[in-house]
Amino acid sequence: MAALKLSLIQKYKLENAYTYVYSTGFLSPACPEQGARALLLTRREEAPGVYTVLVLSETGIQEIKLGEDFLDRENDPVLFSFGKGFGVIKAKKEIAYFTGDFSSPEIIPIKNGFLPFSKTLPDNARERYFQTVSDGSLIPVCFEKEVYYGLSRCFALLDFDPVKKEAKWKCFSEIEKNAFTHHDERTKDAPKIDSLKIVNHELYAFTSGESTGSVNKWGMDYYALAKISPEGKVKEKLLESEQLKAGGKKSGVNGTFTHSDYLILTPLFNNDDWKGKQKLFSLRTKEYLDIVMPRGMTKHSLYNICGELCLIALYDRGLKEIGLCKIEGIE
């Protein structure tokens, strides 16, 4: 199998203690010669544990604290990049939109239908932070409703116009489960959503199956990558696993879209066929690639790709180190 080889451009030592990489992004242009900037949504470890966006560039790390009002018990903040700026969706109702030096965001309200009895998002929808990528003004966002485990089984599209300072929800859907070979006919549970992407007016979703139990304890039932409609209709399956529980061995893979042609696949277990190593899947060629990390950084994980740039990080009971890498080539 071919492999994507990475070389280190810059390593970032963290002066503060952060919990986890919730989601990431890149600002345009994403190339070393023009001052690449990457985004990382995380959270401070010390109380009150505010969410923070780290802006990574050749000059170092700029920390943007989102404030205690983003600590919503029901809704996670959602990070999305938009050209040279980025937004953070707060509690389904507004966008904090950052441009320039990112010191003072514009607050743009989000419309949810035009009348109280014709809301696009139901009141019981809960926003989830899972990574989203878009090349246009429609931003796909993950949601959960009715039963809340911090997962996502629903999605919505956010129509965003920063020039007019307008935003509105356009749909709220689940992915049709019957389209997947190993769906569970015994339940009504919709497929879980790991990540969403819109590129060239096409909507893509990666699902990690339907299991309601702990996947870390019992494993996944299946996973799949699909091109879907805004209503959740599966238009094309690009990748679909076998029934993972049939062999009696725990297995599972999570998927994360990037600002490139590649989907990052991360196995749940170190004793599976992939030996716990991440792989890439090309949306264009439908081929797998291994990943060769820079020397001395084999324990790091890949979180995003844009052009020839890659964002990696080391997690060990907290976020320990971040690196910006360049793609050396495919070997």
Where are these regions (language model features)?
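Blade-level signature of beta-propeller repeat domains, shared across WD40, Kelch, NHL, RCC1
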Residues: 300-331
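Repeated scaffold domains used in trafficking and secretory/extracellular systems
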Residues: 17-30, 70-83, 114-132, 181, ...
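Short loop/turn segments that connect beta-strands within beta-propeller blades
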Residues: 57-59, 100-103, 160-164, 229-231, ...
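Short beta-strand elements that form the blades of beta-propeller/WD-repeat-like
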Residues: 35-43, 79-90, 96, 137-149, ...
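Structural motif
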Residues: 47-53, 93-98, 147-157, 212-226, ...
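A short helix->beta-strand "capping" segment at the edge of beta-propeller domains
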Residues: 1-20
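Loop/turn-rich, solvent-exposed surfaces of beta-rich toroidal or solenoidal domains
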Residues: 243-278
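Beta-propeller fold detector
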Residues: 7-12, 62-68, 106-114, 168-176, ...
